[in-house]
Amino acid sequence: MRDLKTYLSVAPVVSTIWFGALAGLLIEINRLFPDALVFPFFSF
């Protein structure tokens, strides 16, 4: 039961950090390449 409580207290923290980092990354990509449907560094 203690392990379950530990898991339930860790999972929201990890997911909040993960989604915050992902949102920050998407915001920075959209700041550098606004309205980009195809990113310039993917086209060769």
Curated annotation (Swiss-Prot):
Transmembrane segments: 7-27
Subcellular location(s) per record: Plastid, Chloroplast thylakoid membrane
Key words, A-Z: Chloroplast, Membrane, Photosynthesis, Photosystem I, Plastid, Thylakoid, Transmembrane, Transmembrane helix
Membrane topology: Single-pass membrane protein
One Gene Ontology biological process: photosynthesis
Superkingdom, taxonomy of origin: Eukaryota
Gene Ontology cellular component annotations, sorted alphabetically: chloroplast thylakoid membrane; photosystem I
Keyword Manganese (UniProt): no
Family, similarity comment: Belongs to the PsaJ family.
Function: May help in the organization of the PsaE and PsaF subunits.
Protein name: Photosystem I reaction center subunit IX
Source organism of the structure: Cucumis sativus
Gene: psaJ
